[in-house]
Amino acid sequence: MDYSYDEDLDELCPVCGDKVSGYHYGLLTCESCKGFFKRTVQNNKHYTCTESQNCKIDKTQRKRCPYCRFQKCLTVGMRLEAVRADRMRGGRNKFGPMYKRDRALKQQKKALIRANGFKLETGPSMGPPPQTDYPLAPALHPGAKGLAPAPPAGPPGDYERGPYGPPGVPMAVPTHGPLAGYLYPAFPGRAIKSEYPEPYASPHEPAPPYGYPEPYPSGPGLPGVPELILKLLQLEPDEGQLKARILACLQEPSKGRPDRPTPFGLMCKMADQTLFSIVEWARSCVVFKELEVADQMKLLQNCWSELLVFDHIYRQIQHGKEGSILLVTGQEVDLSTVAAQAGSLLHSLVLRAQDLVQQLHSLQVDRQEFVCLKFLILFSLDVKFLENHGLAKDAQEKANSALLEYTMCHYPHCGDKFRQLLLRLAEVRSLSMQAEEYLYHKHLGGEVPCNNLLIEMLHAKRT
């Protein structure tokens, strides 16, 4: 049985991108994909792919590879059990309640889009949420439950507002610095010489770059997950490989530094190596890899500390222990140790960070939302500072649309989740800004190891 839908939502078929005609076999699809799916199931057809089982499926070439087209039908959530075995017209009526529920979600989504002033035809572009005065946690030392008062971040000054509310930074960035060298595909290694051993290469043989896990499963087990989020899941760095590389780096003796590094110095080294994995991740991201290096640098120099903070916070959500924080190396640090050894400012920052961990935990943020939010952070700079405005703006709108669609579909009982997640991004921005200030003052005092990517990023906004 086919069900009508609201045409003013201007839905596109999740399989091929054609205009949808109604609800067919579990979700909104076009007539062509509806008929293809029905014939495939009823006739028990088996296809093979002559390429690598990764063919592009769109309106113009959806008939070229039936194997990949059918796999995509299953991936986006079309239901095998909804096809009638008796070859009669109409789907199975037991899916009626599901269609009605989906229609209700579409109505709710439409209302939310209109309430936030998003564009219906291209997906939402982020409007700024209410500003909040959240003091923040350091990018390198967050952790700990509780809420301790901390001095608020300074006024934005000449900062410009990014697409989800908090300020971005206007920058005139040269394309010849160390980060530029690292971003060029022809120079994948570090272009600056660190006082610490290079984890990517040794005098004897080059080490492989940070590894990525096998592609995230994208079959029928993940129905209703937007394609952008599926791609981002595939690009997530492997936590085990990152842990092993950082541990190896920490265990090697420091060149020209016979003295034992301080705990804070070790934390900075962890952050520096994590930052390299973040750059590797960004280089592989859809849209980002299509930008010119100058634009890539502007984006990374704008959001590097946010990505570090967010990476740490999500690790604590997965860790799930209130009395300790989990480092990227897999080591646990008791909060009592932090309280005893850290200064008052650092301790208050740690407590503020853990409060954000608790907020996101209460929102039940999952891995799909995490990767989408991380992508939004990467593209948080106001597009007017970029050469390729259109590409970056398109990335922002697609990510917002994907996150809204995902939260509405998978958390219909939390109708406000999309907005709440964006508010948390504003807090992450605030946290990272204060963390940068803390780290910069530590650097001026000689407590942060010099000549590395972390220091380069610290100076980027101050040049």
UniProtKB/Swiss-Prot annotation:
Q: Per the record, where are the segments of Pro residues compositional bias?
A: 205-216
Know the name of this protein? Steroidogenic factor 1
Q: How does it assemble?
A: Binds DNA as a monomer. Part of a complex consisting of SFPQ, NONO and NR5A1. Interacts with NR0B2, NCOA2 and PPARGC1A. Interacts with DGKQ and CDK7. Binds to and activated by HIPK3.
Q: Which InterPro entries does UniProt cross-reference here?
A: NHR-like_dom_sf (IPR035500), NR5-like (IPR016355), Nucl_hrmn_rcpt_lig-bd (IPR000536), Nuclear_hrmn_rcpt (IPR001723), Znf_hrmn_rcpt (IPR001628), Znf_NHR/GATA (IPR013088)
Which gene name does the record give? NR5A1
Which species is this UniProt entry from? Notamacropus eugenii (Tammar wallaby)
Q: Which residues bind a 1,2-diacyl-sn-glycero-3-phosphocholine?
A: G343, Y438, K442
What's an example GO BP annotation here? sex determination
**GO CC annotation terms, alphabetical:** RNA polymerase II transcription regulator complex
Q: Where is the NR LBD domain?
A: 224-461
Cross-linked residues for Glycyl lysine isopeptide (Lys-Gly) (interchain with G-Cter in SUMO) are K119, K193
Q: Show the CDD domains listed in the entry.
A: NR_DBD_Lrh-1_like, NR_LBD_SF-1
- Where are the stretches annotated Disordered? 119-160, 197-216
Instruction: Report where it is expressed, by tissue.
Output: Expressed in the pre-granulosa and Sertoli cells of the ovary and testis, respectively. In the testis it is also present in the interstitial cells. In the adult ovary it is expressed in the interstitial gland, and in the granulosa cells and theca interna of small to medium-sized antral follicles, but is not expressed in large antral follicles.
Post-translational modification N6-acetyllysine, affected residues: K34, K38, K72
Q: Which SUPFAM superfamilies match?
A: Glucocorticoid receptor-like (DNA-binding domain), Nuclear receptor ligand-binding domain
**Ubl conjugation keyword on record:** yes
State the similarity comment.
Belongs to the nuclear hormone receptor family. NR5 subfamily.
Question: Which GO MF terms are attached to this record?
Answer: lipid binding; nuclear receptor activity; RNA polymerase II cis-regulatory region sequence-specific DNA binding; zinc ion binding
Q: Which Pfam families match?
A: Hormone_recep, zf-C4
